[in-house]
Amino acid sequence: MNYKGGKFIWHNNQIIDWGEAKVHVLSHALHYGSSVFEGIRVYKTPSGLKVFRLGDHIQRLYNSAKIYRMPIPFTKKEISEACKELIRKNELNNGAYIRPIAFRGYGEIGLAPKDDHPVDVSIAAWEWGTYLGAEALENGVDVCVSSWQRVAPNTIPTQAKAGGNYLSSTLISTEAKRLGFDEGIALSTDGMVSEGAGENLFLIKDGSIYTPPASSGILTGITRDTVIKLCEKAGLIVKEQSITRESLYLADEIFFTGTAAEITPIKSVDRILIGNGKKGAITAQLQNKFFGLFSGDTKNHDHWLESI
């Protein structure tokens, strides 16, 4: 696998060569999925490299660790500075993707780890383009409703961005691609729309914007929150409410949001065209506002951008 620009890894407060980043086969996380992680974008802007909403991502990392009773042995400031140090060390001057991960490392195997079970932290960074394909941001993607549902409430905490949670996402995305789609959409256990395999979802009908609520089994994404706030600034109201499957087919526009996906239009669901099958006007408007954060065209959000 070619992780372009990836030369060094930050691991437990040390910078090591990429190829030296290894874990023991009896690490707890390898057996039980006991890891929490983040995905963070770095954008090239007219005033230099900027990390997008770094503080919010690091806070969510610690929230996820708290839910799983997994204390991270570094401060938030130390992890934030390590992310920026790694960008500099790897000389990722055209933008990057950062992946910090905290995980239960080598120790006694068992489902209930002891309080002193070691928690390791690693950070990787590399160049990464569009998540769902080179032309996805402009032309949109074809998606299907998955046969796999999101988990029921009080089963697995969906507000934790945890490694084990993503086995569900792997099933959804793998099924979609095997069937010839770009991505899959999961329903919740009550049959309502939840989210994509690794993305939140917005639907537009008759000028109104809808997105599934937190109670639908979603991870409430930071890009999702960004879009909601950009809508508020533009005088667009986002309604967080349940969405039926058939509402997808009848929508005027649908788009995914996520750190990796950014704002990606959906052109069809289950081979049914959405609108005219092209990127809609509101989706385009929000894309422009989102990417304008990094070009300087969208003003008054400098607090979301942190210099390297």
What are these regions (language model features)?
Residues R88-N90:
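Non-catalytic accessory segments adjacent to catalytic cores
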Residues M1-F74, S80-E85, E108-I308:
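Helix-start/capping segments and mature chain N-termini
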Residues I101-G105:
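Short loop/turn motifs enriched for small/polar and acidic residues
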Residues I72, K76, C83, L92-P100:
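Ordered, amphipathic secondary-structure segments that act as subunit-interaction surfaces
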